[in-house]
Amino acid sequence: MERKGHIIWIDDEIHHLKPHILFLEAKGYKITTATNGSDANILNQENRFDLALLDQNMPGIDGIDTLKKIKSHRQTIPVIMITKSEDEWLMDEAISQQIDQFLIKPVSPNQIYMACKQILEKNKIIEDKTTSEYLQDFQRINQDINFIKSLDEWWQLFLSLVNWQIKFDMQVDSNLHNILIDQTNECNKQFSKYVEDNYETLVSDNKTPILSPSVFKNHAQPSLDNGKKVCFIVIDCMRCDQFLSIYPYLESLFQVEMFYHLSLLPTATSFSRNAIFSGLFPDEMIKKYPKQRDSFLHNENGLNKYEEEYLNDQIKRLGNNDKKVHYHKIWALEEGKRFSKKINNYLEKDVIALVINFVDMLAHDSSKIDVLKELIPDESGYRKTVRSWVKNSWFNDVLKVLSQSNFDVVITSDHGSIKVNKEIMVSADKDASDGVRYKYGRNLNSKNKNVMKINNPENFKLPIFGPQFNYLLAKNDSYFLYPNAANRYKNKLQNSFQHGGISLEEMLIPVLKMKGISK
C-alpha cells in the first residue's frame, strides 16, 4: 500500500489509542508514537514527519510547550491538537501558535482520519478532481464553441477558460496546462472570426451598449442618478484573468458584482480609454475635439492627455452639470503614494476618476528588463505579480478607505494584453503608426491570414486621416514587424505582452461594481 504520510502521535495515554492507530495505518499512514514532549522533540529532530497529533495534558512538558519545540525545529509541520480540555484560553493559544486543527476528546477513528486526510491529501484530492472536471469541461467547451452567436456566450466561455487558468496555477501537471493553452488558442481563432464577421454590426447597433463608450454610462451613471458618489477606476491594460485573481481579495472589502464590456478596436489606450472617458467612438471624438485629431496626426505620446476634459463633458451630457469631479492619473509609485495620503481630501467630491498605469507598464517593461522577465515569464507570473501589487501597494490603502466610505466603486480596464509569438511582416510608409499589434496609415498591406485589414474605417467608427487610409489589426498571438528591422525587433518582442489587436484577452474586459460591506 502506498504510504500517504508519516505521523507522530504524542499522548501520555497512547496505549488507549491503539484502535485509532491501527485504523490510520490501515488507511495508509505510518504512525510513530511518543508519550511525552521530550521524547517527541527528539523524534522530531531525527525524522521528517508530515503531521503531528498532540495532546495538551501530559506530565512534564505540556502540549503547548511541545508544540513550540516542534515548530522551532520545523516551522511548517502541520499540527492537530487532540485533547479533553475545552478551555478557551487553550484554543486561543493553540491558534496563536498556528495549529491546523483542534479536536476535543472523545474522538472516533473516522474523525481523526478525516482531519489527517484534509491536511495530508487535500492537494492531491483537489488536483485529481480538477483534472477530472477540466477534461469534462474540455469536451463541453469544444462543443459550445461551434454554436456561439453572441458576445454574452463568448464572455461565459472566456470566463470558463480563465477560471481554469487560475485553478491550474496550483497544479503541477504541465500536460494539462498545455492542453488548456492549446484550447485557449483555438478559442481565440474562433473569436477572431466572430469579431471579423460581427464587429462592424456591433459598433453600429445602438441595441448593443456594451462597448467602451458605454462603460461610464452603464456602470457609473446609475449611481449618480440615484444621488450617490462614484469612484471610477480604470487600470490600464488589466486582463480578465488578473481581475479574477484579485476577486476573492476584493470580496473581503466590498460587495462585488461583475459585468463586462467589449474593448473597441484597436485595443489601444488612445482608442479604447479615450472612448471610455468621452463616451464617444473615435471618429466622433476627433470631430468634437479637433485637438485629438492633431494628436493622432502627429503620433504624439500624449494621446490621452485630454481625458479629464472628456469625462467632465460626458458627465454634463448625461445630465449632471452640478457634480464635482476629481480626475487623477497615476503613472509612478510616488504619485500613487501621494494620492493615497490625500484620498480623504477627495471624498468630498461626487466623482473620483482614477487612471492607473502600473499593469500597462509591467506589460511593456517585462520584455525590456531582465528582472521582470524572471518575475513575469508567462500569464501565471503576470497574475501573481498583479495580485501582489494590489495587496501590498498604495492601491490597497485606497481600496480600504473606499470600502469604508459612501462611494460606489467601479473598476475596469480599457483593454487587456496577450503574449505574442508569431511575427507578421507588414509593408508601410514612414508615417504609419508604430503599434506592435495594430497599425494605421496610408495603404498598409499584409497578406497574412492572422491580420484583419480595415479598408473602410468609417464603417468601424474609426477616424480617417487622408486618402487610402486603412488599419491593420493582428489576430490571435501575432505581432507586426517591418522586413528591414525584423531580426532586431523579433528578439525584443517574441513572448512579450502586447495589445492593440483581436483576442479574448484584449477585448473582453470585466467591470466590477462594488459597495463597501458596511454599507
Name each model-derived stretch.
Residues D55, T83:
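Active-site residues of response regulator receiver
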Residues K105:
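A Lys-centered signature of the CheY-like receiver
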Residues R48-L53:
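Active-site beta3 strand of CheY-like receiver
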Residues I14-T32:
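Two-component/phosphorelay signaling modules centered on CheY-like receiver
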Residues T35-D39, D62-D65:
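Acidic catalytic/metal-coordinating carboxylates
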Residues E13, L22-F23, N57, D92, ...:
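Feature captures the catalytic ectodomains and active-site-proximal regions of enzymes
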Residues I42, I64-Q75:
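Short amphipathic alpha-helix used as the core "switch/output" element in two-component signaling
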Residues D65, E86-Q101:
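Alpha4 helix (beta4-alpha4-beta5 surface) of REC/receiver domains from two-component response regulators
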